[in-house]
Amino acid sequence: DVSEKALATAQKNATMNQVEVNFINTDILKTNDLEALPSSIFHLPSQFDIIVSNPPYVRDLEKQEIKKNVLDYEPHLALFVEDTDALLFYRKIAQLALKNLSPNGLLFFEINQYLGKETVELLQNLGFKNIELKKDIYGNDRMIKCSI
């Protein structure tokens, strides 16, 4: 995550739930290999069993659909992506996952409800397998699970 505040909250939650999680403070768009991150952060394994991401996915054209309390309290950096390349973060994270997922590893994404088909196609084109598109409680496309 690019937000130190978000990572501090995530670390607090991990500690409270007694789970060990490696959180990384970096701009994913400027990272080509997770192993190449500065070792001063902490030692990262060369491969991960699970990668989970909820990247920015709300397009500017969908901004009017966002509830006021979300717009008022959520950082816009965490919500919005340019209309011209709405799958930018998914592409980058998936490319990193191809290099850094263990052979039986899984990639999970929360997705834009309007871009389920496009996100599945992106992952298929990159070579992912066992792609599952899941719906939320309202019947909207919301999550993808896949493997390499």
PLM-predicted stretches and their roles:
Residues 1-38, 47-65:
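Conserved SAM/SAH cofactor-binding pocket of Class I
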